[in-house]
Every structure is written in structure tokens, then in C-alpha cells.
Amino acid sequence: MLLAVGLYSCTEDPLFEERARVAEGLPARVMLDFRSEKSCVETRAAQDATYENRVNNLYVFIFNPAGEVHYRNFFTDDISYNGDYSKGSVMIETTSLNKVQIVCIANLSTESVSSGYDVKKSDMESITSRSDLEAFVMKMDEHTVERSTQFMMTGYAYDDKNSTSNLVNIPGTESGPASLECTLRPERTDARVEFVVKTEKPSDKNWTALDFRPRGWRVVNV
């Protein structure tokens, strides 16, 4: 499944109530920050952290409380990075709305980006609701444990004051651009594994040297 991050829309955290409701339907030009999350799960071959967390492009959905698409856009050259390619911001032009969910998909396949998954902008353009996105299945270009240096990521925007709430209010910005009080947190959809093979001299042997040379290897049930 493409959208594997859990939903929290069934219940509202009390902290969310502190966010004042906004007048809906007003023009909104808002800055949305993103920061790729470092995954603790390790089930595939490792790459340098520079590549593990790099965001090359970003497709952003905003879903209204009914799960319908309120806004969508594919960001490529118009991403503002902050220090490195794992964090930055994008400018969103939409209309004000309460209790939306903002979802991102990073590193879609383009002429310059290849993550090993055959997911393109056209696939995202066919999405009409949050349930469509949740049902979308990513397909790998090839079945291998080797990984490229570009990785598919998905994630929600979470409230900056309540890291468990993915419900966001988008304010109108008649007086000028504003920053949303939330952060997109894309995470890799794959994982990595590290196999550590150690050899030790048996305690009951008097070996002076030990040479271990595997002739091959195979990974199953990853």
C-alpha cells in the first residue's frame, strides 16, 4: 500500500482544540515545511544517509474532512531546501479550510528520478480521494534487495504542537503569505537490512587462524 501511515481522524486530541477554527473559502497562500524522517526499521541494503533521506520531488495532497481532494500539486524545481535535501518547504496556494489532512509522496519517477518503484505523476493525478490513495499499490520495477540512491517516501503533515495529530487548519492569508503550523514528515516506504556475519574460534580448538569465504548468499522472507 502506498499510504501506510496510520490515520488519526477518528478521534481528536485535546491539544487540537487549541487551534482556532478559521473562516473557510478564503484565498490562502501558505508555506508548508517538510522534513524526512529517519526510519529505525532496517530490512534492505544500506545507503549513505545523504541518499536515504533525500527528497528530490514532492507530490502534495490536501484532503477535506470528507476525504475528497481539496488541493494537489507536484513540486520539483519549486522546492526550497533548508541546509540539505532532507528538509525544506513548498508554497501552497489554495483556499482556507478546517480539519484537513495533508499527505505527501516523495520521489516519484521522472526522467531524472528513479526510486525502483514505478510510480509516476500520472498515477497521482488519477487519485480522487484519500481512500483511492490508501488503496494504491506501488509496484517495483525489479525484484531485488539492492537499492537505488533515490527512495519513495510517503507521509502526513503533523501539528507542530501535537506530533500525533494530522488534522490541520489552513487559514486565509488576505494580508500576505503565512506558514502552516505543521510539518510534512515523509518516511521511506521500503526498509533496509544489515546482515552481520561473525566468525569466532571454537573454545575447544587451538586454531591460530580462521578463514571464512562464503560462496554465495540468498535472502528469503524479507
Regions found by a protein language model. Give the residues of each.
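Bacterial N-terminal signal peptides
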Residues: M1-G6
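Sec-type signal peptide cleavage vicinity
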Residues: L7-V222
